[in-house]
A protein has these predicted regions:
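Glycine-rich flexible loops
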Residues: 1-362
Length: 362
């Protein structure tokens, strides 16, 4: 099935409201607790046109050319109504524009299209995500959102699957959705009001966490050579702290908690003892795996090392894991993404495309 393409639309018809959304998108993208690397997406509806973030773009660079893709809302709705709908069918709903040059829309474009509000903002809010990662933490999430019209959405694959899940759950009054292991979706017909809602949610979530600003542990002096192994030492002491705390190392080696962590870092973060026999050979072998596998390694008690060919955004995603670990109590079991979910993400053409958009060699 191929969705009908609408008539071409000129970039000159972009409304002032879209420019305001781009400014807000950049603001969100510069807040690492809301957005990490190429994650998150925003949109605005103008008539039957949906302007949605292009796949692989960074919200922190929302003022750059071809950040938004124009799409036909009616074509997306027609495509989604068919059980046979695929990602390619959604891509066919792009309104032709000679300046786009094969740019793809965010995989979340269907979700943006089926939500009736003019503006839709989807962030990977780490505080919201943290409170979805354990049954013991869900009461804190419910307390934070008390009095708001909101929906909790159990984890489901991003894209068409998430879109259909929201279709089955939502009603017209729902403006806030909390996605398990994934983030926030906030809707509104007025951008100023949406921003106020986002600010209110931020304060509500902040109230559920104890404020503690601690200096990161300083990694030990690295008196071993990893030159030629395909890895380089990380200079960020916050990131290095992930390798210094046994509980954090164990959690990272068990699996991943967020879809984008899988896409940029692989299924888990391996731990390696720098004093074990064959240490350099082991690193060389690990660095030969297809990306994003083994993008970073925990050197036990010494810090993190990052692959020389790692994707753009790798360091941002590792810092995201530090922020998550810092918020999570040590005594709670975590809801990791299972192997089927991980393989689905790693083998998904839409995510492979996003990875290609974030190769340093480009």
């Amino acid at each position: 099935m191929v969705a009908h393409r609408s008539n071409a639309i000129s970039q000159s018809t972009i409304p002032d409201e879209l420019n305001s959304l781009l400014l807000y998108s950049k603001e969100l993208g510069l807040d690492r607790m809301q957005i990490q690397a190429a994650g998150g997406n925003t949109s605005i509806k103008v008539g039957d046109t949906l302007w949605v973030k292009a796949s692989g773009r960074w919200l922190s660079r929302a003022d750059q050319e071809n950040f938004m893709v124009p799409m036909s809302i009616s074509s997306i709705n027609s495509a989604i109504s068919l059980d046979s709908c695929t990602d390619n069918d959604i891509i066919e709903c792009i309104i032709p524009d000679s300046s786009l040059n094969s740019v793809r829309p965010s995989v979340e474009a269907p979700m943006h299209a089926i939500l009736e509000s003019k503006f839709v903002v989807h962030t990977h809010d780490l505080k919201a995500i943290a409170l979805t990662l354990s049954g013991k933490l869900l009461p804190k999430l419910q307390e934070a959102f008390e009095g708001l019209d909101w929906r909790f959405v159990p984890y489901i694959k991003p894209g068409i699957d998430l879109c259909r899940r929201l279709q089955s759950l939502k009603n017209k009054n729902d403006k806030v959705f909390v996605l398990e292991n994934h983030g926030l979706v906030v809707c509104g017909d007025d951008l100023s009001e949406l921003k106020l809602t986002m600010s209110d949610i931020g304060k509500r979530l902040e109230s559920q966490f104890k404020r503690s600003v601690e200096k990161p542990q300083v990694s030990r002096k690295r008196n071993f050579n990893i030159t030629g192994t395909g890895y380089t030492f990380c200079d960020d002491e916050h990131i290095n702290e992930l390798a210094l705390k046994p509980n954090w190392r164990q959690r990272l080696s068990q699996g991943m908690l967020m879809p984008d962590c899988v896409v940029f870092l692989g299924p888990s973060i391996p731990s390696v003892d720098p004093y074990e026999i064959g240490f350099r050979e082991k690193l060389t072998k690990l660095s030969s795996s297809d990306l994003p596998l083994n993008s970073c390694i925990s050197l036990v008690d010494h810090g993190m090392i990052i692959r020389d060919d790692a994707l753009k955004g790798t360091e941002e995603m590792i810092r995201c894991l530090h922020d998550l670990m810092s918020m999570l109590p040590d005594d709670v079991d975590l809801n990791y993404l299972n192997n089927d979910i991980i393989q689905s993400l790693l083998n998904w053409d839409a995510e492979k495309y996003r990875q290609k958009q974030n190769i340093f060699a480009q």
